[in-house]
Structure formats: C-alpha cells, structure tokens
Curated annotation (Swiss-Prot):
Pfam families according to UniProt: TsaD
Record's keyword terms, sorted: Acyltransferase, Cytoplasm, Iron, Metal-binding, Transferase, tRNA processing
Names of the cofactor(s): Fe(2+)
GO cellular component, one term: cytoplasm
Species annotation: Chlorobium limicola (strain DSM 245 / NBRC 103803 / 6330)
GO BP term, pick one: tRNA threonylcarbamoyladenosine modification
InterPro entries in UniProt: ATPase_NBD, Gcp-like_dom, KAE1/TsaD, TsaD
Gene encoding the protein: tsaD
Protein name, per record: tRNA N6-adenosine threonylcarbamoyltransferase
Source superkingdom: Bacteria
EC nos: 2.3.1.234
Catalysed conversion reaction: L-threonylcarbamoyladenylate + adenosine(37) in tRNA = N(6)-L-threonylcarbamoyladenosine(37) in tRNA + AMP + H(+)
Amino acid sequence: MNILGIETSCDETSAAVLLDGRIGSNVISSQRCHTSFGGVVPELASREHERTIVSIVNSAVTEANITKNELDCIAATAGPGLIGAVMVGLCFAEGMAFALGIPFVPVNHIEAHMFSAFIPESPEHKSPEGPFISLTVSGGHTLLSLVREDLSYDVIGKTLDDAAGEAFDKTGKMLGLAYPAGPVIDRLAASGNPHFHAFPKALTSSSQTSRSYRGNFDFSFSGLKTSVLTWLQKHPAEFIQTHLHDIAASIQYAIVSVLTEKAVAAARYFRTDAISVAGGVSANSALRTAMQEACRHHGIRLYIPGTVYSTDNAAMIASLAGLMLSKGAVRKNNYDVAPFASFAAGAIKASLK
C-alpha cells in the first residue's frame, strides 16, 4: 500500500510517502519567517503552508518514484497544533483524497510522535510492541504514556505548565539566544559544565526511581524559568556572557534530568522493560545520552528515532496511518474530519465512532 502523509501542525510543511511498509520519501520545509519574532506567528505559519504545500507534496511523490494515481491512501495531521496551520494540510489532504477517490486517514500528531521511533526505514525495522513507556517531548507537549500490548495507551503524566521544549526556548531567550533556542543551548552546553549552577528540578525526589514510588509522573518547568530569570538578574551581563556555555549546560542538565528520571521511574513502576522517546526535544544530544545510560543501567530497552524523525515530519504521519489501517482503527472514505487544537488521547479514534 502506498500512503501519502502530510504534516502542517506548526512551522514545518512536510510530505512523505510510505511504499509498501517502507519510507520512500520524506520532504520537510522549515519556516524561517518566525525567527525575528522569537516564536511562531500562527497567521504567518498558515500562509507559509499555503504557499509551499503543493510543491512539497509534488516533491515527495516524485522522490518516491511514483505518480499520484499510484497512491492508495492519504493521511494528514488533524491536530493538535495551530488550528489554521492544521487546516491547511488537513483540507488539502481531504480534497486530494476525494479527487483521487482513495481513503483519507486523519492522524493525531502526538500519537504519530509516540510511534515515530518505529518508523519503517528498512524491511528489518522493529514493529512497536507494548507494553512500553512513551516519553513525548516537544515545544508544545510533554507527556508520559503507558502503551499497552494492543497499542492503546493511557497518559500517566503531563506538564502542569510549560512543555520541556518551551522551557528550552524561553530560558534561551533570557540568555539572548536566537529562536528556536533549544538546539543552540544543546550546542553551547557541549562545552559547558552542567554542575556550574544547580537549577531546580520540580516534582522529582530521590526515591522516584524505586518500584515503590507512589508519587505522580507529571512535569513542571515554570519554576525553572523563574529560577533562571531571577539568577540572571543577579549577575552582570559580562559574567553571563563569560559563563554562557556553563549556564546553558546547567539549564539543559536540569531539564534532561527531570525527563530521564520520570521516564525511568514510570518504566519501573509499571514493570515495563522498554521506553520510547520522541518529539522535537528527543533530538537533544544530552537527553539521548542520559536516556541511553539510564536505560542501560536499569536493563531497559530504549527506542528513539533518528533526529530527522524527532522534529515534525510527515513520515511519522504516513507510518502511523499504515499502522492504523492494519489494525482496522479507521473508517474509509472519511472526508469530513474537523481539526482540533489541543491534545486529547484518542481524539481521532473517538471522532470516527
């Protein structure tokens, strides 16, 4: 089955083709127009998607070495995301599927991230097998989920305020770094001292990694932002610039420590031997290293996508659509799916009942 996937939930316009269970193409266009604003401007994002989506889809189909008439299905993000941005890809995909007379499959963007570590890059790829803990970390979401054998899941922890990616970007802005600041902090931290200053790690405890831990698995990063701001205000600009690498490393260490401790604690608490880490923040080198070391220490299998599949991309949309079709989780000829802005577990599945 040949599946075209389309992703436009935020500031990446992406299209990919899944060819009989393997990725045939994955084209991504990242919007640069938001840099001077220090964040994504929704209206600009929508207009950029409108401007580029036709060429991106054409490129994906061409790179896959097929024609549009050889497509068997089209899938697109229906949410969560910036509602205007989501609508561009969703409406385009629904219209294209209707015109070609083939099924349309709506995909939950966060669920696509959850299973992105299992994107079929080759015939030998590992299919997702539950139960496992999924840590999904991005600019807009930070979630811990327990994925069962049938690949249904429960959200067991979420951020109470800011997402991890947002914490990176906002603390980076305090340091005068360009948007998006997450990758910049990662690069600076590589040559910094993560123990230069101990920033707070909210909702963690020394007992959290034990099987008997009875706390929650929620996250909070607003306190970290406040702490960073307060600390920076106490030091002169020259001092901050001199120790910029160390400060970046200390901020990154605080965020990564929380994510790693929570994920491992959840795996041990629910007695699972596997963790999947996905979302834009999963591209962070310190998080990847920390998760690898922690999982190795506790005998836990770690699944983490290549960095090209960590950020928003259409390959994960096409891949999850293929999985959904194989499980009979969607109905065919569904051309009237409404977009949604906020995450709700199983939102698409519920809308199809």
